[in-house]
């Protein structure tokens, strides 16, 4: 299989010397924009961070992705629509056939220290296969999203999402079970 790292015009990359990109497919940072935006995509990889691409993944304009020291971001197949924001302090894993809409935020850390016993600053995030994440969703640390799930627009996901469900709300709660969805493209 051929692996490619495709960067179109509006892309900015800051990679530490010890950062690694593992390509087992193609990743494309796209500047396709139907609204005439001049927003660039940014990828910052700090010391010893790893970006792994398992298949083919597209990232549209306005992405803002940071992998902090020692963090790992693993992408299966699918796409991030415009203005995705990812803050990876530890580990974020995204499965195959995943559709993530615009203005989504995914953070595996609170980005600050808690002052109480048992507080954990970071917890990994895992997003399963065949997942559809709607516009302006926020996914917070420690969440696992099961296969074939749908996250409704505007939701804040603070707890695990079971397979074959639709969740919605702030915080997100299961509103439908035993669902199945397919692409209509």
Please annotate each region the language model reported.
Residues 67-68, 108-109, 141, 159-160:
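A short acidic/small-residue loop/turn micro-motif
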Residues 110, 117-118, 143, 177-179:
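Conserved catalytic-core motifs of eukaryotic protein kinase domains, centered on the activation segment
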């Amino acid at each position: 299989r051929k692996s490619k790292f495709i960067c179109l015009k509006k892309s900015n990359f800051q990679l530490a010397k010890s950062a690694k990109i593992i390509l087992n497919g193609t990743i494309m940072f796209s500047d396709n924009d139907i609204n005439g935006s001049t927003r660039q995509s940014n990828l910052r990889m700090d010391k010893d961070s790893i970006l792994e691409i398992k298949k083919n993944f597209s990232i549209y304009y306005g992405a803002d992705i940071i992998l902090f020291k020692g963090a790992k971001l693993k992408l299966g197949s699918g796409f991030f629509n415009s203005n995705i924001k990812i803050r990876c302090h530890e580990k974020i894993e995204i499965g195959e056939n995943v559709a993530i809409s615009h203005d989504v935020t995914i953070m595996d850390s609170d980005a600050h220290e808690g002052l109480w016993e048992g507080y954990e600053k970071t917890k990994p995030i895992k997003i399963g296969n065949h997942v559809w994440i709607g516009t302006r969703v926020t996914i917070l640390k420690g969440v696992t999203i099961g296969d074939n799930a749908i996250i409704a627009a505007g939701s804040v996901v603070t707890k695990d999402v079971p397979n074959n469900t639709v969740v919605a709300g702030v915080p997100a709660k299961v509103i439908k079970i035993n669902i199945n969805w397919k692409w209509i493209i």
